[in-house]
UniProtKB/Swiss-Prot annotation:
Catalytic activity: D-ribose 5-phosphate + uracil = psi-UMP + H2O
Gene name of the record: psuG
InterPro entries listed in its UniProt record: Indigdn_synthA-like, PsuG
Species assigned in the record: Dickeya chrysanthemi (strain Ech1591)
Protein name: Pseudouridine-5'-phosphate glycosidase
Binding residues for substrate: K92, V112, S146, A147, D148
Protein family membership: Belongs to the pseudouridine-5'-phosphate glycosidase family.
Molecular function as annotated in GO: hydrolase activity, acting on glycosyl bonds; metal ion binding; pseudouridylate synthase activity
Source species taxonomy: Bacteria, Pseudomonadati, Pseudomonadota, Gammaproteobacteria, Enterobacterales
One GO cellular component term: cytoplasm
Entry's cofactor comment: Binds 1 Mn(2+) ion per subunit.
Length: 316
């Protein structure tokens, strides 16, 4: 039985998610930024529904998270997804933005960081995202570090992703996670992946090939009293991947151009991502869809394995 507080004033559960948590079924949280900021309407709605479908196909219940009317939506209905997808100007809400958006009663599209806040409050132990934020290149001067990394240290949620984007300093990102004692497990891969690229060039601290062992490892982390996330990475399918050296060359050139144009801070990431998309002639669109689907599917599989573990140990 779930220990979730279904009467929490800041949470609005869908009936399906509420029933799943109450009866101990596996649930996977999903962000809503992909709906409000990822693709144009109606492609954004179709993509969100496709992501939910692959979670269901693995035997888990999807819980897409948004913010509306002063509460987190824990499990968005088709009507919710349609409304968010068709509405222009919904702000992207990271962890720091949550209090103000909730207080004002507005809408917000959740990022990795804010989705983890909501998932942890709701008692959902798994979250899927195509890729996480990290330490930006030049962070030793700019101090530009994604809130995702900080939130990992605060939220008791397993995060399934295809690593971090190549535009980041992936070496420093891994160093930060090590310093914060956030476990990194690469599923059926030796290397830490880099979103569009199967390998970042950095080895993963741990490789595990069995979903049951991954599930046990996650639970062991929490049984040790840790309140932090566990990061599970899985690389993009080989047929959809983009060569690491090609991407690195594009990023270096684009970063120099961005510096020349005075583009920094929040504007740097979309600038670099657009540069990669242009230079690869849109191959990043296919790659992005690939990792959205594959990470959601793996999260569903691992959530089921984790539920099986809890049931075997009478903890579900």
């Amino acid at each position: 039985m779930s220990k979730t507080d279904f009467s929490h004033e800041l949470l609005r559960f869908s009936d399906e998610v509420k029933d799943a948590l109450h009866t101990g079924k596996p649930v996977v949280a999903l962000e809503s930024t992909v709906i409000a900021h990822g693709l144009p309407y109606p492609d954004n709605v179709a993509t969100a529904q496709k992501i939910e479908a692959v979670v269901r196909a693995e035997g888990a219940i999807p819980a897409t998270i948004g913010i509306e009317n002063g509460r987190f939506l824990i499990g968005m209905s088709d009507a919710d997804i349609e409304r968010f997808g068709a509405t222009n100007g919904i702000p992207k809400a990271s962890s720091r933005d949550i209090p103000v958006i909730l207080a004002q009663g507005g809408k917000g599209a959740t990022t990795v960081a804010s989705s983890l806040v909501a998932a942890d409050l709701a008692g959902i132990p798994f979250f899927a995202s195509a890729g996480i934020g990290g330490v930006h290149r030049g962070a030793e001067k700019s101090m530009d570090i994604s809130a995702d990394l900080v939130q990992f240290t605060r939220s008791r949620v397993a995060v399934v992703c295809a690593g971090a984007k190549s535009i980041l300093d992936l070496g420093l990102t891994l160093e930060y996670l090590e310093t914060q004692c956030v476990p990194i497990i690469s599923y059926q891969s030796d290397d830490f992946p880099a979103f569009y690229c199967r390998s970042s060039g950095f080895p993963s601290p741990h490789r595990l090939d069995d979903p049951a062992v991954v599930a046990r490892s996650i639970e062991m982390h929490w049984k040790l009293g840790n309140r932090s996330s566990v990061l599970i990475t899985h690389p993009i399918h080989e047929n959809d991947a983009i060569d690491k050296d090609e991407v690195e060359s594009i990023i270096r050139e684009a970063a120099l151009q961005a510096e020349h144009e005075g583009i920094r801070g929040p504007g740097a990431t979309p600038y670099l991502m657009r540069a990669v998309a242009r230079a690869t002639q849109g191959r990043t669109v296919k790659a992005n869809m690939s990792v959205l689907i594959s990470t959601a599917a793996l999260a569903g599989k691992l959530a089921c394995a984790h539920t099986d573990y809890l049931r075997q140990h009478n903890q579900a």
